Structure formats: structure tokens, C-alpha cells
């Protein structure tokens, strides 16, 4: 599961502490270990890093826009051809958040290595600017306010819209649809990068398991190897992975 679930599991006593040695820890990107640390202890092995990206139809749009501000004009151009520029899930904040956060919006202020839950940045000037831009896209009929995950996914996979915003979990369905697609970073807004939430797909060990050492052996010497992750990735795309050596191979693709 993604790492955001693991704090609750650990709090309930469901996860065993893991103790990989430094040599193994060095094989993975350091920030991924931070995602699976609870009260100073490691509670899972990071597998992959999931985040939203811009997915585009290469046949409809060989060169995707670099900025959100380009999208209205692009949509007008594509509408003249019976297509639309962009459709994505507008029903869940997870998908709209990257735009809201781009110019300075934030959930909780992060300072000195911790979050201040009393400092919420969803109504500051940057958040309002991003949300206003999104509302204007809807008001000007560049997007439909009723668009949800399934509607957006179907439209992209049928070639009806040139772009969508989704994560690596969506790639296998696009592969099945035979759309000629590319994946790139989300557009910038007012010169600032979009800021999606990041999930670290992780594997933990049940605290009640009688086979903790076997589980550790499997995770460290089979799953978290180039060959192990390649086998998983062929079945279900992982996106970016925590293992440095295999991520370097993926980066060549």
C-alpha cells in the first residue's frame, strides 16, 4: 500500500519494525526511507514512488504544453477538430491539488522538520489563484465540472481528449487502449511547478508473522532487485522506483 496508510497500521501494532543494514538502505533513495519511518523506526520497505503526471496523446498533441496558461488556447484549437485539450478527475482534491499548490497553497506548514497543523494554507493568495484558474477553465467551457475519474479515463483512452492527469496505476489501461501516449511533468502555473502529493508504495511485515526473517529475505533479495522490480513492472507499471539501480534503467526508457 501507499505509505500514508502505514502510520495507522503501526499505531495499531500491526507492523514489525524492520532493520535493513546500511548497505541495503543505501541502495534506495534516502527520501523513500523517510516516508516509512514512524516514531523514529522503519516500519516498511519502500518499493516505488507514485505521483500524478501529465499524460498526453502523441497523435493529437506531439508537444504537450509546459504551462497551465497555454491550455485555453490549445483547447479552442482542438475543439475545432472535435477534440478537447484536457480532462481529469475534478471530483477529488487529490487531482486538483497540484494546481492549487503551485503558486503557494499548502495543506499544513512544514518548518524545522515538522508540520504545524495549526497553519493551514488552503486559503492563501497562491491557493486562491490556482483555484480561480481552475474555475475559469470550467466557466469558459474548457472543462466540465462533472468530470470524474471514469469519465476522464474513458475519454482519454478513446482518443477524445488530448491530455489527462493521472498516475502510473492508469498506464496499463492506456496500453490496452492502444493510444500512442507519453508521460511528462505537470504544467507550471505562474512560473511555478505544479505540486502533486507523492505516495511511496511500500511493503511491511505483519507483527504477528512467524516468518519475519523469510519475509525480509524475500523483500531484500528478491523483490527489491532489478529483476524483481522488472517482473512487477511488466505486470503493473510502478512509475518511479525506490531502488536506484532499476530507476536508472527505467530513466533510459
Please place each PLM-identified region on the residue numbering.
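Paired acidic/hydrophobic, glycine-rich loop segments that form the ligand-binding mouth/hinge
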Residues: 162-166, 182
